[in-house]
Amino acid sequence: MEKSIRSTILSSFIILSLAVLINPNCASAQSIGKNQINIRSGPSLRSRVLFQAPLGYPIKIEKEQGNWVFFRDWVGETGWVYKPFVSNISTAVILVSRANLRSGPGIRYNLVGQAKEGDIYKILEKHGKWCRLGYYYGDKPVGWVDSSLIFGD
């Protein structure tokens, strides 16, 4: 009896975990895959254009409707974008006026540069709470940054 209850609880936990992982309404991090893409107020070409997003613009997808995705960005703005314009490339935007870039994942590593607020980079690698950033094209690394200083994956 006790083994049956444990088995039922474990099975329920696994099913719920899988439901969360495959639920398209759960937020996932992606980016805009083309330059100057219209972000709209609704899931239609007839919907009002709210703004244009640059290549690599990091977004958190909250839901999908047909060929459209609804997202939220780092300042809390929301909008709809045509799904083929969304990329699975992980990108990040710098959230602070100046973020130190280091040669490795930690404050003990040498300072190699700084990134400024609003700069967008590709996330090349993760190590704990640190992300290795690089340029969108060519994967040339620029340095490691503490993930609390960025919005992205």
Task: Spell out what each predicted region is.
Residues 11-21:
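Bacterial N-terminal signal peptides
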